[in-house]
């Protein structure tokens, strides 16, 4: 797979935010739901240029991204989104593997995340375990799976 990874740039904020919305819409959510999560899925130029947001691209086209908040002993996978046209092609796996390696490189022993319920099976396939549920910041009453990866020493 000829995917290249690099830090996002501030001038890509709108493109990255649009990709996140299209990826979320892939799961068949209603327009009202998507409007409710729009702010949460909007990435500022500052976030994009912070170094915590990494894009996967092929031939200059962004196929997906992740944002890792590094910490020791625990890092947080704040987001991971794949362009709908690239879902099922290995891009998500490549992004996840890269994020977990980055967390391990800074000394994290675990990586936690709040997953979309539709994405929980994807993360479980790669070893994530559910450690609870957390309330959605955008949708009152909605609970999200709280997952954890235990990293090898």
Enumerate the language-model features and the residues they cover.
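A short beta-loop-alpha structural element at the N-terminal edge
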Residues: 4-18
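Conserved GNAT-fold acetyl-CoA-binding loop/helix
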Residues: 17-43
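A short helix-loop-beta-strand connector motif used in the catalytic cores of GNAT acetyltransferases and
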Residues: 43-55, 76
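Conserved beta-hairpin
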Residues: 52-64
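Conserved beta-strand in the GNAT
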Residues: 61-69, 76-81
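Conserved acetyl-CoA pyrophosphate-binding loop and the N-cap/start of the following alpha-helix
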Residues: 86, 90-98
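C-terminal "cap" of GNAT-fold acetyltransferases
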Residues: 109, 114-118, 126, 132, ...
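Conserved active-site tyrosine of GNAT-family acetyltransferases
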Residues: 123
């Amino acid at each position: 797979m000829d995917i290249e990874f690099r830090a996002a740039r501030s001038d890509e904020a709108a493109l990255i935010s649009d990709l996140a919305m299209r990826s979320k819409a892939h799961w068949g959510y209603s327009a009202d739901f998507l409007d409710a999560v729009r702010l949460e899925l909007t990435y500022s130029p500052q976030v994009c240029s912070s170094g915590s947001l990494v894009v996967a691209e092929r031939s200059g086209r962004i196929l997906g991204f992740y944002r890792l908040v590094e910490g020791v002993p625990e890092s947080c996978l704040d987001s991971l989104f794949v362009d709908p046209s690239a879902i099922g092609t290995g891009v998500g796996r490549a992004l996840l593997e890269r994020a977990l390696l980055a967390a391990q490189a800074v000394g994290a022993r675990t990586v936690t995340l709040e997953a979309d319920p539709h994405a929980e099976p994807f993360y479980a396939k790669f070893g994530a375990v559910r450690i609870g549920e957390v309330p959605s910041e955008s949708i009152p009453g909605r609970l999200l799976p709280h997952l954890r990866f235990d990293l090898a020493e």
